[in-house]
Amino acid sequence: MADVYPVDPAFAADARVTREQYAALYRESIEHPEQFWGKAAQRLEWFKQPTQVKDVSYALDDFHIRWFGDGELNASVNCLDRQLATRGDKTALLFEPDSPDAASYPVTYRQLYERVCKLGNALRNLGVKKGDRVTIYLPMIVDAAVAMLACARIGAVHSVVFGGFAANSIADRVIDCQSKLIITADEGLRGGKKIPLKANVDAALKIPGTNTIETVLVVRHTGGAVEMQAPRDRWFHDVVDGQPAECEPERMNAEDPLFILYTSGSTGKPKGVLHTTAGYLLFASYTHEVVFDLREDDIYWCTADVGWVTGHSYIVYGPLANGATAVMFEGVPNYPNVSRFWEVIDKHQVTIFYTAPTAIRALMRDGAEPVKKTSRKSLRLLGSVGEPINPEAWRWYYDVVGDSRCPIVDTWWQTETGGILISPLAGAVDLKPGSATLPFFGVQPALVDAEGKILEGATEGNLVLLDSWPGQMRSVYGDHQRFIDTYFRTYPGSYFTGDGCRRDADGYYWITGRVDDVINVSGHRIGTAEVESALVSHPKVAEAAVVGFPHDVKGQGIYAYVTLIAGETPSDELHKELVSWVRKEIGPIASPDHLQWAPGLPKTRSGKIMRRILRKIAENAPDQLGDTSTLADPSVVDSLVNERLTR
């Protein structure tokens, strides 16, 4: 089995970036960042050209991150207006519905522009002003992109909430950013099932603290019956359709906020990752063009949901700023059958396909036949995102899906980074299954030990980034101190990613997974603290500890240890009740895969739960527990080992 897949000479001959160009551009981006990013800024259309490029200090006593600080622009103008002259009739978004029996349809750049302008005008009429926050809780439909771009047009800050989150999660996010308006739909569709979006919003808005919401706009999507509460609730199309199809864009400073996106942290509630306008848009569009080797006639399909950062950067902002055609898919990989992805690729002649290892591993289980009965001849490049891809899944993706002729870009990045940081460029970098390979322009990875000492050569350590890049998040919304403490205090002078990583003798990077209390489930980050607090909020639960464990399909699963209050006894009914309790509190993605009853939890004498031990038990590695003598009650461990659910 090949360990290295060299660059295909035919691909390299026509690639946007060759091996030599990558080396030269990377060197320039590190040695002369002002010059490099100053030139790159010409990709964008500005109302006022920036004269400053980079103004960054990671010093804790003078901390700031500013890019293109005196420039003025508008993100929606860059995604829509500037495309109209040459690409007005080109398809911007190709909508593919949940059911293959429903009609798919193209939306051109001109049509998208008009829809965005109409919604922008409607939002202004409803009192939404520059800087106001708007919550978007929609399925994967074109109106989700319209809503994001309409906010950008009028200078409102959008906060998209994934349609799989439950009422409590919506309320948390509304309260945290003091949102003024929600855009939702009657229902979503996923794998033939209806998701009660409007009902979830109604439940969320009964929770104290959500009364900043003045208006709920409801897209009629399935036509399902919903309760409408006047005057708060309005039908989206009643409010929007009659508006003028031109809308004056707001002039935004480069560092004005574009959006907030909530992501799980290792402590407590999700944090609102704040991205600003120019640096984010530049980085999303530049990485999209270069990493995916974009051509004018490509049909590009990223299977992510707009509720995650991948959907923000690589379905909406990156592709549209580049004038590309992107598929927007409402469905799931296995509905109505496990050939659905490949059928959609053939139907729309998709050339670039970007998905998550979880989807690949799930589809691998059904073997090659459901793939091989489709053509997939249109494909020329494959991508992977969301979590490390194991070499077996990589090879299956390469051999079976790509017929051993499409390079794979295995992209590592985070909600916080705005865009891809480590990835091969298919015309420039030889591939190794399981490795994200080399850094993108301007990105300076380093590996450090626990003390923060930089490690050289082939080694393993904690992944940090030594300097800023334009797409970097600027703050945690409403809590700048938390931003500094989370990312810059652990290893002063650098950004701590929270990921472990090894570097091989060729300088390639291999991401090994989170080193903090965050679990990566199917490419979605879940904070263990979130799941624990959901469990503990149940009246019968005294204590809970949650860890990740290796999962064949999801990458990591959720393993919960639960101690009940005195007088309560474990039962199958209570087990089911607790799992559905977590689903209700957070959403289905946070459902525990295993829930083990624990008479007690392993604690130090100071009362700290020893998660390291719980992790090893969940990983079915009881021989690797290490020293348990420092525990307040070492006997607790034996009973947990004996009752473990993963052996």
Swiss-Prot record:
| The keyword Metal-binding is assigned to this record | yes
Q: Its biological function? A: Catalyzes the conversion of acetate into acetyl-CoA (AcCoA), an essential intermediate at the junction of anabolic and catabolic pathways. AcsA undergoes a two-step reaction. In the first half reaction, AcsA combines acetate with ATP to form acetyl-adenylate (AcAMP) intermediate. In the second half reaction, it can then transfer the acetyl group from AcAMP to the sulfhydryl group of CoA, forming the product AcCoA.
Q: Encoded by which gene? A: acsA
Q: Which InterPro entries match?
A: Ac_CoA_lig, ACAS_N, AMP-bd_C, AMP-bd_C_sf, AMP-binding_CS, AMP-dep_synth/lig_dom, ANL_N_sf
Residues that, per the record, bind CoA? 190-193, 310, 334, 522, 583
Recorded catalytic reaction(s): these are:
acetate + ATP + CoA = acetyl-CoA + AMP + diphosphate
Q: Which residues carry this modification: N6-acetyllysine?
A: 608
Residues that hold ATP according to the record: 386-388, 410-415, 499, 514, 525
Q: Which cofactor does it need?
A: Mg(2+)
The residues the record assigns to binding Mg(2+) are 536, 538, 541
The protein in question is named Acetyl-coenzyme A synthetase
What family is reported? Answer: Belongs to the ATP-dependent AMP-binding enzyme family.
The species this protein belongs to is: Xanthomonas oryzae pv. oryzae (strain MAFF 311018)
Write out the PTM section of this UniProt entry. Answer: Acetylated. Deacetylation by the SIR2-homolog deacetylase activates the enzyme.
What Enzyme Commission number(s) appear in the record? 6.2.1.1
All disulfide bonds of the chain are none
Which molecular function terms from Gene Ontology are attached?
acetate-CoA ligase activity; AMP binding; ATP binding; metal ion binding
Q: Which UniProt keywords apply?
A: Acetylation, ATP-binding, Ligase, Magnesium, Metal-binding, Nucleotide-binding
One GO BP annotation is: acetyl-CoA biosynthetic process from acetate
Pfam families reported in the protein's UniProt record: ACAS_N, AMP-binding, AMP-binding_C
| Record GO cellular component, one term | cytosol
Tell whether Nucleus is among the UniProt keywords.
Answer: no
